Amino acid sequence: MKKLLSTIGLSICFVIGGLNLVFSNDLKNEATPNEFTIYESNLDEWETLAEEGNLIAQFNLANMYREGKGVTQDYKTAVKWFTLAADQGNAVAQYNLGIMHSFGLGVVPNYKTAVKWYRLSAEQGNQMAQYNLGRLYYLGQGVPENFAYAYMWANQASSQGFDMGEELKGLLSELMTSSQIEMAKNLEKKCFNKNFEGC
């Protein structure tokens, strides 16, 4: 029962975290998505640039379709554009794909695929992806239940000031022995030394 109640509380971030929009002012600037603002009147220009492989345009179109801003809401189209941006290494697009696969937004729900996208984003330091990956290890969704990995990823999110990561780490600390926590910390050191690749 305690695990169930904790899981319900921790699920709030799982849903809300993927709803952040990131936009831009300059369609042709090579800036990061965090520096951009979308104007609905630029839809044709966004689509042209996105088709040409522009990461910012792909990312922003995905957000427009996911939120229904300036276009009819269409999760499948959002997944298409997020996937193209994620394939170019955009950590936020990877995180958003994790959310969409977790909840079946525009795709069949698939925790294994969600884990793939969260992991790619988490390896780049995305704290929400780190938290969600830890949460999936805690619950055994898409991966075998593994409190050591759950603790490691929760600690990574927590170390960046992400409160939900700290809460998950605290919950896990109550469920794990001191030797299991020590093992998780050693695992984290090993993974840190290889930039979390394969962790």
Which residue ranges define each predicted feature?
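Bacterial N-terminal signal peptides
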Residues: 9-18
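Terminal, low-structured helical/coil segments at or just beyond the last alpha-helical repeat
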Residues: 30, 163-199
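Short helix-capping/linker turns of helical repeat alpha-solenoids
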Residues: 46-47, 51-54, 67-69, 74, ...
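Hydrophobic face of amphipathic alpha-helices that form TPR/SEL1-like repeat modules
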Residues: 60-67, 96-103, 107, 132-139, ...
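TPR/TPR-like alpha-solenoid repeats
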Residues: 64, 85, 100, 121, ...
